[in-house]
Amino acid sequence: KIIHTPGHTEDSMCIYTGNALFTGDTLFVGKIGGTHSRENALKEYVSLHEKLMSLPEETVVYPGHNYGTSPVSTIGEEKRNNPFIIQPDFEAFLYLKNNWTQYKLEHGIT
């Protein structure tokens, strides 16, 4: 199943098959793809929260790059641990995106 996930780019997509989700640059382990405007950040927020986080928690996430603490994760792990996913609303999500460099320094994230 192809899932259109605009945000990082307008044509971003993820591939969901069986118990696997290939996320490209949309979702990484503990991180997400970058955006360059509020509008794109909102699209990304909707893609992540309404589309990807609605998948079963045991779904294995295979990002396009290994930028996290592990090369793979699960939807459940991302719901519990990804700082972007656990934000309570879009404004908090956007604040984190705009202050990601400082957040990484404060939390020892590379």
Regions found by a protein language model. Give the residues of each.
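Catalytic core of the metallo-beta-lactamase
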Residues: K1-E58, Y62-P63, A92
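Accessory terminal helices/loops
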Residues: K43-T110
